[in-house]
């Protein structure tokens, strides 16, 4: 909080993936407004207008012609909130915070409780404080049914129970913001929980690239405990390690700027060798609001795929960016192509096997064994490189295998989180084919 207030210029740049997630949340929030139409949008033109819009919001509460407000601004005890939706409910108001997720986390409850604290401080008569989120059981059938797409959860009772502790915390935070210097806080698990901190680059600037903090065999809690107890170099850390332990192998890889893998596990998992291998790259799009009849929120759509034949070097490509309803055609093509090979290798955070079962691409469970997610194989083989702790992607693994080379990998996470087809076209194009070539090279290298 102190850094956001006093040194915002030190904040790490938002990744494309994170920006896309924010965009998804915004899109869902705007759609949620149609559940309560004809509202007054209180979004200020700039931060300098917050005070003015707060005053206008308070005036609107007493205007009988205004029944709904979007992004209503309230300020209490130096704490500002922008409430997603505020709906008149008789003599009181129904406060609604919109979430684009399928379930509610503790963080969402705390967020709503803070909003209720400010509303309560502003003496707004609240009939209920609710979280509005996406119904995981909704199935599209024709036009989107906004009444079925969203579900509500009352959190007013929870929020009321949190008023005292929130007031205490707000006053503590105000004291922190008023400090002349940034509070001294050791790096630790809070850097990544519940979300990755936006000032990681600043706070971690003294941590060496080959620090034992980047290892994965120990828990983060244990690593930070050692680091903050004064053991801040690898030499001191080694005193706690078995020379033949995975931890020691990872540390050696860090210091030699190379990778580590348990080849025994790798060969057991990778299966028999064959030249009849297809390298598969599938692009998923998982829209929060289903686009196709029969689909649920966040159900994946196969929007593109690329298959590289190991033997011939030929590539088969397909996409349905212009019309997602053509996905069924692509599934048939994909099914026929995969039948030609003894082994199919892909690299993805998604479980493609489950997806293929869902769409009946795999008719026999025996076929599952020829489809291999190299990401899972490497993780289960204890693969480690200095960058893989926080980014276990084909890009970082490739850099570990081939230090003098660097690749650009289109991110499925990015593309799953955005509906921007232009972005998809720009990133996918030849990148899917190129990524398959990188996957092929990495696969062959590891088999040597």
State where each predicted segment sits.
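Conserved RNase H-like, two-metal-ion catalytic cores of nucleic-acid enzymes
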Residues: 74, 265-338
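Short acidic-glycine loop/turn motifs at beta-strand connectors
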Residues: 88-92, 206, 309-313
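Long, highly charged low-complexity segments
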Residues: 231-289
